[in-house]
Amino acid sequence: MLDPFSEKAKELLKEFGSMNEFLQAIPSLVDIEEVMNRLKFAKESEISEDILNIEDIRDLASFYAQIGALAYSPYGLELELVKKANLRIYTERIRRRRKIRSDEIGIEVKIAVEFPENDIKTLEKVYGGLPEYIVSLREFLDLVPDEKLSSYYVYDGNVYLRKDDLLKVWSKAFERNVEKAVNIIYEIRDELPEFYRRLAGEIRSFAEKEFSDKFREVQAGELKHHLFPPCVKNALRGVPQGMRNYAITVLLTSFLSYARICPNPPRRNVKIRDCIKDMRVITEEILPIIIEAGNRCSPPLFEDQPNEIKNIWYHLGFGYTANPTLEDSGNSTWYFPPNCDKIKANAPQLCTPDKHCRYIRNPLTYYLRRLYLEEKRRAKHADEGSDKGGKERILQ
């Protein structure tokens, strides 16, 4: 198997019915030790031949076991480990394959068979031979927007690639597909067998040893408004009558509370008292933002419906009350942020997607992803600064 997101892989998965059914079957196909062995080699210089030559169905089971486990921590150390290990496996398999067919990898690729006669000599001179593959210009720019087109041969709406160039484009598609798969399974993680939760714990422990010195896990902390999804930013500006209760009580209340208190909840039925010891986190940091947004509505929500504040507490899991204590947590369900499909259905005006919304299924995972990317940039700049400082010390 060259790519778990290829058409060939999808055909194999059809034998199980749906992805959910395949996820239910995986614990009977592979065990946690086998899945972890696939990840632990990431620290080794060579990949085991047993891993490279595993049968297709076990390969898919091991890979999607990791994706299922990532649903419990979609953005963080674990994602870095899973992407790193699997990119090495599938990259090595692709390198070993003499010719790659379109149905074997997760991007639309064709074999380059025809070239303008006048360009053949130039191509052979620049590439040291004729390029082997073709990818549409549109897909190329989508996957590797920072690449300089002047470094490639472009003709008739296609980019001509050598195998190493194709691997560069494919790896970007693979990473994007991993995130897409995790976001899909995130929505059904409460239906998964206990196997995935245990595997998630094993992956977390190993990932902390592998990456903790370079990358901090996304944790509860001060809200970063500039990283909020568009739907939340729109709700914060205030909305007209007809959308107020959904935007403020349902969306903002759930999003702000989880984003501040428990951005990466281990399960859906968590209680606020499991996550904080001081109610001031809610009364001083979260509730004022909700009330301000309600006051920006037309007409102002809490002037028009003063008892709606009790409904806010109800959605936070404290029951229908105006003055709860921490001990009241659990008297009702702490509502999880609605997914993107529900927001589109109930308040379509809130949904104005930006470039970060692609493949995201829930506003909370949008926020997690933005935090994750910001942390990656911080770690990268820290490494670059460390390298620069080291060079300066050497020169001195």
Curated annotation (Swiss-Prot):
GO terms for cellular component: primosome complex. Pfam families: DNA_primase_lrg. The keyword Metal-binding applies. CDD domains: PriL. Its cofactor is [4Fe-4S] cluster. Belongs to the eukaryotic-type primase large subunit family. Heterodimer of a small subunit (PriS) and a large subunit (PriL). Both participate in formation of the active center, but the ATP-binding site is exclusively located on the small subunit. This is DNA primase large subunit PriL. It comes from Pyrococcus furiosus (strain ATCC 43587 / DSM 3638 / JCM 8422 / Vc1). The lineage of its organism: Archaea, Methanobacteriati, Methanobacteriota, Thermococci, Thermococcales. The gene is priL.
